[in-house]
């Protein structure tokens, strides 16, 4: 069977990676106090490409290592490797090529610190989370979420090299937002798909501790998220435009989390899951707009 370009594209989890690289892009813009220079634009564009390719490689490796699990779950049973559209060796070669190209771009044309952090994130998700954490503990998403939370720092590093402690602190605040966002985001999906995870013997929180406990944890993390998203304002990274947007977004997210304690139907968790994606995209969009377009409201 001939492998189509679309099959390779699907291996990269394009929708997931799009959100990842968007947060990296926002990290780049926030790292630059004024309008970027031509050198920063060029470096940022190459950094964006390198991060995107690395994230795509991580997604492909994840599908390679999770093929048996994916075959048992309705949500993932269509993936190219599962249905035989691609062979394992083709996935391995494809992912390896993406990694080589990504690291070459980052080391040669961006900077070494971005390459190191990007590679560490790739290993954290594609290997440590996929091979060990996912199968070992109900806190898999909490611990493994750190690897998926690093893109804003990768973007920040690409255009600055993280030369000062302030750069590290500010970039880490963006990482913290995604890190705290990940559990309520993914647990909402896991509640709806808990039968699939149980069938595949994956110890997701709804499987190991039950749905009521998971709903309470979603509320706890959503409250923490609402607090953490105020930190960019307290350190002067963002102003009132971002603050207003964050307050509205958090109010809706908190309503979903509270309603999850006694949801109207089984599909409500998927509604919260869908909103969580919109939430993160909008939150980072507010960060970027506040930084670039509305300096006069600070």
Swiss-Prot record:
Transmembrane intervals: 16-36, 45-65, 93-113, 114-134, 141-161, 172-192, 223-243, 244-264, 277-297
Keyword field contains Transmembrane helix: yes
PROSITE patterns, per the entry: UBIA
Domain of life of the native organism: Bacteria
GO biological process: heme O biosynthetic process
Annotated GO CC locations: plasma membrane
Topology relative to the membrane: Multi-pass membrane protein
Alphabetized UniProt keyword annotations: Cell inner membrane, Cell membrane, Heme biosynthesis, Membrane, Transferase, Transmembrane, Transmembrane helix
Pfam families per UniProt: UbiA
A GO molecular function held by the record: protoheme IX farnesyltransferase activity
Location in the cell: Cell inner membrane
Coiled coil, from the record: none
Functional note: Converts heme B (protoheme IX) to heme O by substitution of the vinyl group on carbon 2 of heme B porphyrin ring with a hydroxyethyl farnesyl side group.
NCBIfam families: cyoE_ctaB, PRK04375.1-2
Protein name: Protoheme IX farnesyltransferase
Organism: Xanthomonas oryzae pv. oryzae (strain KACC10331 / KXO85)
